[in-house]
Structures are given as structure tokens and as C-alpha cells.
Amino acid sequence: MSNYYAALALTLLAGISTGIGSLLALMVNHTNKKFLTFALGFSAGIMLYVSFVEIMPQSGQTLAEEMPKHAAGWITTAAFFGGMLFIWLIDQLVPNFENPHEMSMIGTMNTAPSEEARLHRMGIFTAAAIAIHNFPEGLAVFFSALSNPDLGVVIAATIALHNIPEGMAVAVPIYFATKSRMKAFSYSFLSGLAEPLGAIIGYALLKPFLSPLVFACVLGGVAGIMVYISLDELLPAAEEYGEHHIAISGLILGMGVMAVSLLMLA
């Protein structure tokens, strides 16, 4: 039970980082785009490396203890792509205009009165879109932490870093539309709470069926979710903010840091 609460706490911390993003957006006039580019690339490197080197092998190894090795390989692969399919389907629910991947509006808002209604709508829909996306991210953090608390800390920190610019994407249009810092912060903060909510709902649905076999399949799906987030959200957002080579440098360094961390935890 203590692992459950620790995993939930990590998921909550990852989720509320959207609020940190809103505070940063409201406190500073200009976003350091080079830093954001590097940070998003760094996050992608961590998530890609840990998915392929740690989570996928762990899923396959657990399944191999429950069934023939050949069948375990097929099921691990199916779970991985099933996780990708799951978050892709969620992605299709969000119109492109409100999709949180499209965050180029940060720092470029027009404050003309004629824009206020459009900006308000943009902020609300962006908050809703991020809330939808945070459900599977919450599952990824929660089940990673249940499997390995040390790994859960790394995943939670990575997701938290990823959530900061999403918090900015919610706060900026809401603030320019309403001139209310409290409203901008509230929408951003609440969108992040979908992350622990997704973890609680997912755990409640799966708890009656949890076994080493099911848990291994969930981990395979988590790896797929994390790879999708890296390739569909983090790297494109890093490119959107600016310099390609800075993003790639962050990606490589993220992989290196994750590799050293796993070796030290082994």
C-alpha cells in the first residue's frame, strides 16, 4: 500500500507542474526558447532510452516467466504498440487548433480586444486537450513507480518537465483574454490534475485483474505511450521552439544521463 501512495504522490507532482508552467509564463515577459528546446529534447532522450532499455525488457522478462519465450515476445510487442494506439486514439479526439502540441502561441499573443474571445476559447480548449492527454501520462508515471520506485521518480520528473510548457500554453491565452492571473493559473493547474485522476481510474479498473502477467502487459503499453509522447510531442515541440541542433544535443544528453542513472541503480 505504501508503494501505491508513493506512486500516486509522484503522479500528482508530475501533474501539478502545469501550474508551474503557468506561473513561469505569467512572471516573465519572454520565454527562453533555447532552454525550452534543450529541455524538451532532454526529456525525449530520457523517455526513449528508458522505454527501450528498461521498461520493454522488464515487460518481456516478466512475461517470459509466465509463458513460452516466443509468445512473451509477441505479447510484449503487442502491448507496446497497443499503448501507442491508445494515446493515438486520444490524440484524434483533440482538434489541431486546440492540440497542446501546437504551442507556438507562447510569447506571441495579440492583446487587441477583438482577439479576447478567441484567445479565451483557445485557452479553455487547450486546457481540456491537455487534461485528456494527461490521463495516459498519469498511467505511465503511476505504473512505472509501482514497478520500480527509482524509475518512477525519473519518469515523474521527465513528465513534469514536459508539462511545464503545456501549462504555459494554457495560461498565456487565458491571461491575455481575461487579464486575470488567477484564472490563467487555475485553468492550467486543473488541467494537470487529470494526471493523478487518470492514474486512480486506471488502477481502479485494472486492480481486480492485476497479476504479474497483466502488470507486464501494462508496462509494455506504458513504454509505447512514452515513446509516442517523445516522438509526437516532445521532439516536435522542441523543433517548434527553435534550433534543431540544440534539441538533438538535449536528446543525446538525456539518453546519456538515463544510461548512467540506470547503471548506478543496477
Curated annotation (Swiss-Prot):
Signal peptide: none annotated. The keyword Nuclease does not apply. The gene is zupT. The keyword Secreted does not apply. Zn(2+) binds at E137, H162, E166. GO terms for molecular function: metal ion binding; zinc ion transmembrane transporter activity. Keywords: Cell inner membrane, Cell membrane, Ion transport, Iron, Membrane, Metal-binding, Transmembrane, Transmembrane helix, Transport, Zinc, Zinc transport. This is Zinc transporter ZupT. It holds the Pfam family Zip. It is a multi-pass membrane protein. NCBIfam families: PRK04201.1. It is found in: Cell inner membrane.
